[in-house]
């Protein structure tokens, strides 16, 4: 018999990137990258083409080109792969006029003790899934697919309750026991006002 959640797919293609208004999956990796010196806009186009097609295949439970472990690509389990750009990205590709006005360094608050090692990056991937093995495989594959253009700056892992452990739509608790995400956008109108650009 088929395992619960194994074949569940979040469509990769749509009006917006999957993984933003998607119900939270149980496991998360956020990987931040810097573009290596000498990377050109043509290099970035190639990277985005490769990442887009590989993410599309992985989220469908298919093996992407260049995969080293095809047997690990078969359980999509709500896998989403979402890409974001940092402020410096637009400088590097020579498109500063396309950088959103609000995309700037995060302000420092008086109590912050921020470390540069965990700071902003040129690109980030948010990879979420209900299966930790699929998540690990997708993370490794997408990082490897970045090739010589990228240097991994940092990675953070996160988690929520397993699917079915709480009622759908329940606001999760963080490790301090506090409800986390209570005021996140919920409705289409809120997403239109605060999220989509």
Residue ranges and their predicted role:
Residues 2-197:
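Long, histidine/aromatic-enriched segments associated with O2/redox biology
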């Amino acid at each position: 018999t088929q395992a619960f959640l194994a074949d569940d797919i979040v469509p990769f293609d749509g009006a917006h990137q999957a993984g933003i208004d998607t119900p939270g999956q149980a496991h998360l990796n956020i990987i931040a990258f810097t573009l290596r010196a000498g990377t050109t806009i043509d290099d970035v186009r190639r990277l985005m083409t490769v990442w887009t097609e590989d993410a599309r295949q992985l989220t469908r439970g298919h093996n992407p080109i260049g995969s080293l472990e095809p047997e690990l690509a078969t359980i999509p389990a709500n896998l989403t792969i979402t890409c974001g750009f940092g402020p410096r990205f637009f400088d590097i590709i020579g498109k500063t006029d396309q950088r959103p006005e609000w995309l700037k360094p995060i302000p420092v608050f008086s109590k912050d003790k921020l470390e540069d090692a965990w700071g902003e990056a040129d690109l980030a991937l948010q990879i979420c899934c209900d299966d930790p093995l699929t998540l690990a495989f997708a993370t490794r594959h997408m990082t490897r697919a970045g090739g010589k253009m990228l240097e991994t700056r940092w990675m953070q892992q996160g988690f929520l309750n397993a699917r079915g452990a709480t009622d759908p739509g329940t606001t999760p608790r963080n490790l301090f026991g506090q409800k986390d995400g209570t005021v996140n956008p919920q409705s289409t109108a809120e997403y239109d006002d605060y999220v989509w650009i």
